[in-house]
Amino acid sequence: MCGIVGYVGQKKATDILVEGLSKLEYRGYDSAGVAVLEDNKIKAEKHKGRLANLEGMLNENPIEGGIGIGHTRWATHGEPSDVNSHPHLNNKETIAVVHNGIIENYNELRNWLMEKGYEFKSETDTEVIPNLVDFYYKGDLLDAVMEATKHMEGSYAIGVICNDEPEKLVAVRKDSPLIVGLGEKEYFIASDIPAVLNHTREVYLLEDKEFVVLTNDGVTLFDEEKNPVEKEVYHITWNVDAAEKGGYEDFMLKEINEQPKAIKDTMTSRIMEEKEVTLDDISITKEYLDNVDRVYIVACGTAYHAGVIGKYAIEKLVRIPVEVDIASEFRYRDAVITDKTLIIVLSQSGETADTLAVLRDGQAKGARVLAVTNVVGSSVSREANDVLYTWAGPEIAVASTKAYVTQLIAMYTLALHFAELKGSKSVEEIEEIKKAMLELPEKVEEILKNTDLIKEFAVKASTEKDLYFLGRGMDYGVAMEGSLKLKEISYIHSEAYAGGELKHGPIALIEKDIPVISLLTQRELMDKMISNVQEVVTRGANVLGVCFKGDMEESKRKMFEGLIEIPETLSLLSPVLSVVPLQLFSYYVAKAKGFDVDKPRNLAKSVTVE
């Protein structure tokens, strides 16, 4: 992985490829490269490091030609290096390939090809693909790619060009996203929509094992048996400007500030006072819910933390047992799944490999799967039984912010919808929650206007090596997200602990002047959290507290080095507000350390490999 772009047209391919790859930089990468057909011969340029390195080399050594493929790599097999970068060529340098995914049987294929006389330069799994295509090439590139994929196990989205058919680009996907852009006498492939937005809003969303041939005359689609495929054109509706910084210094800061709108958009037409929750893409009935004996919420990373909050909300409002699990763990633990199981999967991109695997495994065992995702047309959205979209808009920064808060809104919305169906809460209780939800955008805006204390504490914390987050109940779920954000972009070691677990080990880590952030928005647990704060302060910690305005007694304020007071809301909904200071805190720590907050090291936006 990480980013693929391909182009067929009359313009200079390298310009289109580099521009497209720049729109995919947010996905994370460690090297970049292109291969273009110039005078019926493949010319490739690839380098470790930033896209600017590649662009500089292409300025020094221009490559002409209107057909080419490009790639930004995030290392999975082989260290980041020039030789391991994509595109990869066959031994004769007549076939070039870019690839996202993992070829699981690449060692077997590599050994088999070596027995046939092929040699390998890199440590990557991808290099087997051009040589495998070469082995099966008999004058038709599509046939060769089709035959090669029959022997490839794992996940892949690939783009292929060949000297012998210089007018053609062939691509295919399996368990890794790939779209086809339809322009005016020019055509594209890409691993994500932003790469083609400057050129077209009309795309095909490829399904697994669909092949596509791009030429100057148009686009032809085939299934794995080489039968022609007719597809509906998907029109991209969101604005190109949504994928630009719009005057902000960083995408992350822009996206933090877009949260009020994202929250409002995700509730629009769904949450209304004195009206039942409206979810058009979900056909779950009261009869179905009455038969459900357990709910699993499954996700990865930040989405998992949203799932933790979802568990609290659904259990509280719907009174159905809920388990929340990490997708990469859940899929291997032989969970009890029947036709009475509802699985809720969360994935910002809709392409997270482990989450997709859970979706498919769950359906195979008879479960119904409901997906919460931000990307219309993604694999998760197409394969799930029901879909709830989070209308966060494009999220470019690797560290998720607005996608997370809209996932929270989605989970609350689901919980309310299920509660209405089952009658598990009174109309008055549900109306109180709806009213409070509709007030959240304005309250987030209020937090965003008061950042001085957050900045001050962040600058002090930026020189520390360790930092801890504490919380109980829903606050613990938010603490986990705050800790992850800090790790992701500031590279400071951080852990989140449930307040009640302090005495069971973590308190041994507390020493003089160590920074601790304590969340205190769960009023029924306030006294217990105050005791936890006292425990760490006694041992020398400097504590920043997050609580509702007016909740902290004057006599207890002196324990805190600082106290961020957020607008009051229901304890159930507090994560939407309390996470915002933690996002800003992580942002300002990383900026104080001089780090790139949008593209943190070693991380990718969309993890499409297992």
Curated annotation (Swiss-Prot):
Keywords: Aminotransferase, Cytoplasm, Glutamine amidotransferase, Repeat, Transferase. Its EC number is 2.6.1.16. The keyword Magnesium does not apply. One of its GO terms (molecular function) is glutamine-fructose-6-phosphate transaminase (isomerizing) activity. Residues 284-424, 453-600 form the SIS domain. Residues 2-217 form the Glutamine amidotransferase type-2 domain. Homodimer. This is Glutamine--fructose-6-phosphate aminotransferase [isomerizing]. It comes from Clostridium perfringens (strain 13 / Type A). The gene is glmS.
